[in-house]
Regions:
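Ubiquitin-like/PB1-type beta-grasp interaction modules and other compact soluble beta-rich domains
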Residues: 1-87
Length: 88
């Protein structure tokens, strides 16, 4: 699968916008992404290794909920990680 990073996440991946990861599930892909780009780990995952709710995941344009991270994914899937922005 290919992870596509944008916005403030780029600085944690040495400004690499796309990172290809070989993994059977999105959960495994996130773990391997954090191994490949260690500075992303504390940004994407909490102390228990769970995906932080401040971010949203989209696979091939469709939002994926946290409960779906263990579902099988294909090698050609494109995963976008978007940071939710709030303010006033």
């Amino acid at each position: 699968m290919k992870f596509v990073l944008s916005g403030n996440l780029l600085r944690f991946s040495s400004f690499g916008r796309e990172v290809s990861i070989d993994a059977p599930t999105l959960s495994d892909g996130l773990s391997r992404l954090c191994e490949q780009c260690p500075s992303l780990k504390p940004v994407l995952l909490d102390g228990d290794g769970k995906f932080r709710q401040i971010h949203r995941l989209f696979v091939n344009g469709d939002q994926v909920m946290v409960g779906e991270l263990g579902a099988p994914r294909g090698a050609g899937d494109e995963v976008q990680i978007v940071t939710a922005i709030a303010g006033g």
